[in-house]
Structures are given as C-alpha cells and as structure tokens.
Amino acid sequence: MTCTVLHWIPVFTRPETVNILLDSLSFLSQEGLKVYAYVVLENHLHIIAQSDQLEKDMLRFKAHTARKILMLLRERNIHTILDQLAFYKKAHKTDRKLQFWQEGFHPEWISDDKMLKQKIEYIHQNPVKRGYIDKPEHWRYSSARDYSGQDGLIEIYKQW
C-alpha cells in the first residue's frame, strides 16, 4: 500500500513527523496489523501489511497520523506546509480546512511468497533509486535494516 501526502508535499523530512507514523504502525501492530515491510520517504510511505480488517486499520492510521501531524505543524508554526495543505484540499472535503493525505491507500493483492519478496525488494530499493543512499539498509526509515540483520525501528513480521 502507498499513502501519499496531499500534492506530494515533503512533510516527512522531520524526524518528529516520521515518528508519528512509526508509533501509529506500532500501535496497530499490537491491535493485529502485521507489518512485513515499510519505507518512509519525504512525502509518502509504502507499507506491506496484513490484517483481518486492513481497510479499517488503514483508515485509522491515516486519520490518527493526519491529526497528530497537523497538530505538530500548528504547534511549530510551520505555515508553509499548512498553507499548502489548505490550498490543495479537495473541494468536496467541506468538513475541514486542511487535508493531509491523498485519498485512498492503493492496496495490491500479494498472491504468493515470490510476489511478496519482489514487493519488499521493490519498496526497499526506493531510496536507492532516488539516489539518497547506496544500500537499502542505510535508509533509517525502512524495514530493510530488519532484513539485513540490523535492529529496525518497529517490529516487523518476517514469517508469512
């Protein structure tokens, strides 16, 4: 699945905003979400996960993280991002002044182990393809560290 900040605004350049995402994923893991892999880039994140109520979990994730990140941006008076989120808000979102996430989360069905491994490799390569790092495990906000034997930032399920 991919969750993207509205208009690809680079919000996840601050550790505090990424920590909100990771804390939320950790909480949902305790509630039954199995996170197999993730990568957080500056304006979106990829998650490979499984749950009996995946759509509900992702809606909870997006609602909670949007609320917490917007609160943080307001507390820090980061008006450039807040103004962009207000400007690009979808017109039909009349119940709010700001929109944080693009609509949807674009889930893809993973049918077997081979496909799962391909998807994990693909998302872990994202920061490498962008030229940010040389090896996937060098990206701090990625489960590639877990798969290379290092300690990651959140619990990852490696057995599927």
Which residues make up each language-model segment?
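Short catalytic/metal-binding and nucleic-acid-binding patches
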Residues: M1-W160
